[in-house]
Each structure stands twice: as C-alpha cells, then as structure tokens.
Amino acid sequence: MAANGIVIVDKPQGWTSQDVTAKLRGVFHQKRIGHGGTLDPMATGVLPVFVGRATRAVEFFESAEKGYEAGLCLGRVTNTQDTTGETLEEHPVTVSRADVEAILSQFTGEIDQIPPMYSAVKINGQKLYQLARQGKEIERKPRRITIHSLRLLEGEELRLEVLCSKGTYIRTLCHDIGTALGCGGCMSSLRRTRAGCFTLADSIPLETLIAAEHPEQYLRPVDSLFADLPAVTLTAEQVKPCRNGAAIA
C-alpha cells in the first residue's frame, strides 16, 4: 500500500529542504512528496513533510505561523545576513543585553521587511539568490510581515525567540536589529521550534526515518494538520450540503 500522511522531520544542519524530501521519496517509496516551508541549510528543526495524497493539503499549511530560536551575532555584517556568508563589515560592539532587549519592541507587530538577496524570492522571473551569485544586487520592495512575539532568551549568548508569520526572514530580522543598534549584525544559528500546530516534540530525526524498518509508523493523518482549529460536528442531514459547498446553519 502506498504511503500517505504527514511526517514531522527534525531537519539536520547542512541539508536543504529539497534534500530531505528527495531522501524521503526513497524511504517511503513514494514520488509525491513535498514540504511545508523551506528551511535554509544551516537551520535545523521542524519541517513538515507531506507524503502521497497528503500533498493536496500543503496549500492549507502555507500560511501557518512559525516559531524559531535564533542566534544573534552583533558587530558583523555579511552578504547572506548569516555567519555562512562573506563578511562585508565589522564593528566594535558596545551595546548591552539591556540595549538589545529595549530595541526589540521596534520589531514586534506588523512591520515591513526587505527580503535578502540570498533568497528564493523571484523578481522578473529570476530568483534573487541566482542574481546574488552573479554579484548583482537589485532593488527589492518591502514586504509586510507580522512578528507576533520577540524576546531575548536567558544565557550568555544572544538568542532570540521569535513567533512570526509566513514569509519572515529571521536572517533579515537579525541584520535589521544589528543595524538599529548601530553595530551591524547577522544570524549565527537557527532552529525552527514550531510550524503551525506542530512542534519539536512532534518531530522525528531524519536519521531515525532513514534507519526505520517501517517508517510509515511515523506518518500522521492529514486531519492532524487542523488539530488547533475549532471543530464542528455535522448532523447526518448536514453532511451532503456541506460536501456540495452549501452554507450550514
């Protein structure tokens, strides 16, 4: 029987999201596989993967909120807005944790964010990262995003906890925070802790899936996608009109 369902992968560092889906095609012996939100290679964490007929449900997941923990590196500006990129500027860091905490409110709520050149955003049919690799930089229009919550986590290192809308670039958020502080900044690490109703507690390490004799045991039913939504129980008389798209009183 062909595999169908949703598996929540804890993506390892160094893998692209497409690498993960390509690997799982072999694991589940299923060609129809897609993921619910790209993670950069340096990032780890929650990557929902839709298998078989469940791929039809991806469209219902695309607007899901995302949660992240990100490392903030101050004093360094790079071309990719993270520590994997080429250093463009370096500045002394004289700001304190209190200074960082005080500025976070500027980046909470609905804000405009300019997508980075190293991204898959298309302008005039070309992906920005393709232009960036050619040494080109073009004007990008700001996009409206929502940062639902943003706080600095405890610890010696600067780590941000972010809950945000679809389309938010955490790399750019780190870059913009550094700019606002006057010393520049970039992202040093990224872990997705939540995607929609799925969290790290739901995720399975990729190596576990690869090694599993029966990987289908980790598949969730498609209706798990809607676990955090209010439910309505239909009467027998309401089922048919509902299937036909009619309003239910």
Predicted regions and their residues:
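Acidic, low-complexity central loop/insert segments
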Residues: F60-D112
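Short, acidic (Asp/Glu-rich) active-site segment that either coordinates a divalent metal cofactor
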Residues: G67-D82, E139-K141, C174, C183-S189
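Extended alpha-helical targeting/anchoring segments
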Residues: S119, I123-P142, T146-I147
